[in-house]
Amino acid sequence: MPLPLTEQKMENAMSEVKSKIKHIALSAKDVEATARFFVDVFGMKEVGRFDAQGARGCYLSDGHLNLAILNFKNDAVAGAERGKDWYGIHHIGFQVESLEEIHEKLAAVGSRPRDDVNAALGVGRGHRQESNVEVKYTGPDGIMIDVSQTGWEGTSRALDEQAAPVRTKETQLA
């Protein structure tokens, strides 16, 4: 397992990054319900809709990332290895201000914690609390949603006042 980056090493590593993730596409059975989930729970905004020969869908954004919600009309456009009836992506992570608040919002729309995955990761057992706590939930069409107050290594900390301090090998040994 790689050691956490110090802030200086992080800055140096990020200066070499030439591309940034700006788009994630989800294949969904119900475009409207899936879009409504991300709008209602995470505050994303709808920025476009389309109905083309191979797919229909909408685009959502948080101001930094484009999230396409797609419903494919044929296997060729969806990709033959998956086909038009395959839905999902493994998981999408959201940095939030409060795990308790987002838990209430997720519960209100019928989303439940993935206790199996959370247990396997040790969430709630103390040792994960020392760094990042990622709590997994199930979203529309079984899409796994990951929520965290501290964000992930290698990403900007948009919620700096909520973020835990960066832990280096030196501070862990102190």
What residue spans do the PLM features occupy?
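Secondary-structure boundary/capping motif
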Residues: A28-M44, H91, P113, E134, ...
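Core segments of cupin and vicinal oxygen chelate
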Residues: S15-E16, L26-K73
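Short linear motifs in intrinsically disordered
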Residues: E46-D51, G93-Q95, G122-R128
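A short local loop/turn or secondary-structure capping micro-motif enriched for an aromatic residue
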Residues: D75-G79, E153-S156
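Short, P/G- and charge-enriched loop/turn segments at secondary-structure junctions
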Residues: A78-R82, G122-G124
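Vicinal oxygen chelate
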Residues: P2-L5, E11-V17, K20-D30, C58-S61, A80-A174
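Generic short beta-strand segments
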Residues: F72-N74, N118-A119
